[in-house]
Amino acid sequence: MKVWGAHGEFCARHQWEVIVATLALLACAASVERNGPGNRSEHCAGWARACPGLEAEYQAADAVIMTFVRCAALLYAYYQISNLHKIASKYLLIIAGVFSTFASFIFTSAVASLFWSELASIKDAPFLFLLVADVARGARMAKAGWSAGEDQGKRVGRALALLGPTATLDTLLAVLLVGVGALSGVPRLEHMCTFACLALLVDYLVFVTFYPACLSLVADFASGRKEMSPDSPFSEADLKPNPVVQRVKMIMAAGLLCVHLTSRWPWSSDNGIIEGPTDTLTPTSNDNILLHSYVKWFSVSADYIVIATLLCALIIKFVFFEEQRNWVIDMNDMTVKEVVQEQARSKPKFSVGDDSNSEVSTQTEGVLEDEWPTLSPSSSAAKLNSKKRPMAECLEIYRSEGACVSLSDEEVVMLVEQSHIPLHRLEAVLGDPLRGVRLRRKVVGARFQTELAIKQLPYLNYDYSKVLNACCENVIGYVGVPVGYAGPLVVDGKPYMIPMATTEGALVASTNRGAKAIGIRGVTSVVEDVGMTRAPAIKLPNVVRAHECRQWIDNKDNYAVIKEAFDSTSRFARLQEIHIGVDGATLYLRFRATTGDAMGMNMVSKGAENALKLLKNYFPDMEVISLSGNYCSDKKAAAINWVKGRGKRVVCETTITSDSLRTIFKTDAKTLARCNKIKNLSGSALAGSIGGNNAHAANMVTAIYIATGQDPAQNVTSSNCSTNMEVCGENGEDLYVTCTMPSLEVGTVGGGTILTGQGACLDILGVKGAGARPAENSARLASLICATVLAGELSLMAALVNSDLVKSHMRHNRSTVNVQVQAENITLKVPTL
């Protein structure tokens, strides 16, 4: 397996080298001189002239057998195309068919012409390739090569590691089986079988060398295109062979090998040559020659009439009568199970706009999947269709295996309903996250009578392996949030497209308008890595002991001991400060530490816990009340975060010219500065706001948080922002704007950043993963968020002074259902006095 994987990865990573080398060998084989003096065959003059040895082609047995072979090839090709149409998208069908049939045909013809010139030009070669080509194997390879996850080379290598041994055994068995035809004694069939054996061998070599390289190359060119991705999720179970079938194939191969050894025994006849008289047909008259020609023409015509009729029938059936359905394929045994889908269509009418009476009609289609029973990647059709076994037997299988891989979906649900399997552990027990989510949806829907509602919640085409034990539990699906972009927004001299995930209309458009006003001048930012905090609450017997404990911690030498214990828990967490709050005999130890590119809550909690264990050695009478005493303060509006900071402290500034204010915002600097003072400063102070001296910073913060996999609940603290506006410039017509955000809690590793979509948004910003220096990427993300907040603040303030807020929300954020028809039938009763 490792050898196959390494070979496949090599071919995928050295695409051009493998392709060029293969084509070079093809060119060499095609250019070799084959027509030597003794190899040129004699041709007969005239189509009606009888030639020696030619009559064998028109023997009755020969014609019947060849017609049967050609028809079988057409039927098998039709079967292959039908199955491929169900396996995946039409693109996999095209690529697998081209590379498995056309490439192998070209290479086999070149090799055959090099060694056996009489085999290279046989007219039944296309039928042979239809009969021996395994297009489904190429489709499986393509589906695995385009699955999500590792890089292209590793995906192709893993697929070849799973398919390589099976392909080797299948090729060996096919060569031995087809080789039996070479012992039939029918000349044409012998030639065809010899050519077919050669075709199988060359097709195998193309599959393990040329095909992986081409597949990797096509995948690189088509990366990011939705239509080129597989229609159903890929699982390694799709490629794993059935061990029982493999053993049967090995037994068959051994038996066929014995047949070949017996039939081809070298001393079965003298010199292995069967001698016999050679009959030649000598025409006696022109009438006999003409009659013989008619007979030959009729036999050939009858042969092709049968084949043409069959081919036309198959084409008509496939094009006009083939029913288009959705199928799910078990890739192990090519068993098909139909999945019927309900389609619910509704056509609501919406009125959108200001005073316009025009109606915008939209049609939405909701697809409700019929989930029971569905063929999952890890369960076979036999398991789904088999009779449900008794509870005791299923329970014994589950306890003996420690898993439910061999149980059907109905049997697993039965164990869940009887409380033998916890509902939250389905993914771990089944070993298949997607199947676990699907069965949980079934159980929850039946238990709470919400089947129809759950069916409307999407769950397919999502990598739940990244969610498990990292982001969410009891998963039943996912909610798609639209992601828009604002920009380009120039920050510190570099333009960025800012991804924002939101369902609030006008937010992205408003932020984009602010970015346009900022223009090429851009935003200048400064970032300070304050560090994440955690504040355990500890209690001492009395205030004297509490005072002694506080003094002990404040001592520099003792602090160094605590810092060493704290820092030992992580490669990145580094303790910066212990700020102590006192309430009677209770101490609140606010540990503040830098955490690299991670947001760092878990790091700081782990370090604080280890520091408390050390402190317990010096103060045995100390009691740990809680690892978090709300003095941190996490996910709550608190002045301590506003004053001392938490996470990243960011300050951004920019200057908007008077021209931009007039043309884009339709206002001036004095108006905006006056509104900012009255609204953001005086109004927030009158309301007693903590860190709320801004227009709507939380909007931009939360939208970017959702898009980039941050903790959305952290927006409570992270949205602390002070927006200031001042007039500036020679004539006092320009506007100087600053945004100060002292507690932006962000990270580019861990948490939701590991998910595919969120990671893509981080990649758009160029801050995915850990930076070259600790906290480099997280600090850059914090500065981009603050700059986006500044752009959004500008746009909203301009909309407020121009009374554009309601108008823009009516246009972008308010879709009113047309209730005119319902309103006509409303009767209003007015009570009499």
From Swiss-Prot:
| Topology term for the membrane | Multi-pass membrane protein
Q: Which GO terms describe its molecular function?
A: hydroxymethylglutaryl-CoA reductase (NADPH) activity
List the GO biological process terms: coenzyme A metabolic process; isoprenoid biosynthetic process; sterol biosynthetic process
List the NCBIfam families hit by this protein, alphabetically.
HMG_CoA_R_NADP (TIGR00533)
List where this protein forms a coiled coil: none
Q: What pathway is it annotated to?
A: Metabolic intermediate biosynthesis; (R)-mevalonate biosynthesis; (R)-mevalonate from acetyl-CoA: step 3/3
Task: Tell me the gene name.
Answer: HMGR
Q: Where is this region: Catalytic?
A: 420-833
User: What spans are recorded as compositionally biased (Polar residues)?
Assistant: 354-365
Q: Name one GO cellular component term.
A: endoplasmic reticulum membrane
Query: Transmembrane segments in this chain: where?
Result: 10-32, 91-117, 160-180, 301-321
- Locate the region Disordered: 347-374
| Record-linked Pfam families | HMG-CoA_red, Sterol-sensing
What biological function has been recorded for the protein in this entry? Synthesis of mevalonate for the production of non-sterol isoprenoids, which are essential for growth differentiation.
* Name this protein carries in UniProt: 3-hydroxy-3-methylglutaryl-coenzyme A reductase
Q: What organism does this protein naturally occur in?
A: Agrotis ipsilon (Black cutworm moth)
Q: Which family does it belong to?
A: Belongs to the HMG-CoA reductase family.
